[in-house]
Amino acid sequence: MRLLLFFFFHLLIFLILITSYSYAEDKWNFEKLDGFNYGALAGEVTHGDKLRFIMRKDHCDTVQHVVTFYTYQKPTDISQLNGQKIPVQINDVSGFKIKAFMVRPFLMGYQVWFSLGSWPVDTLASALKELDRYEIKIVDGHGFKAKKYFDITFNNWELDDVGNAFQRIKSNCIELSEPKEKSIS
């Protein structure tokens, strides 16, 4: 009986550990597209808002940090956000601006793509490993009213397993960068 209880207890711990690892891994989405590859996390507030880390073929030491926000708001001048620096708070710290680089119709509203810059992979990965969650809030700024363009002005992303995710993105980039062998017919 004692042996059975011991075995059951260890099996239970093993299953809990495997499930939590697989849950963190399932949160990440990895893709390769036309010379680029990325890892993405869905938002906790608006699932369609993605936090993306993009690497370009042959540039596997640099990562582009990108976020998308979806909005139902449809002001006639929403396309003027393209190219603008928008004020945000990141993890409750004010004073940041992120650049909108694409505004496109999406579903019943618009999707706005923002760049948070390009970073050395190891630098950004190390910084993000220190955090449990990454939160962005679009805020009012000089001549900019967040609620005019965004019905939901904030989102956050759980950074579970971010270190392993960055390793996978980099491995995918290196694989994408390797020359393909051509067969001679």
Question: What does each model-identified segment do?
Answer:
Residues 1-24:
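Classical Sec-dependent N-terminal signal peptides that target proteins to the secretory pathway
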Residues 23-185:
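A generic "folded-domain core" signal
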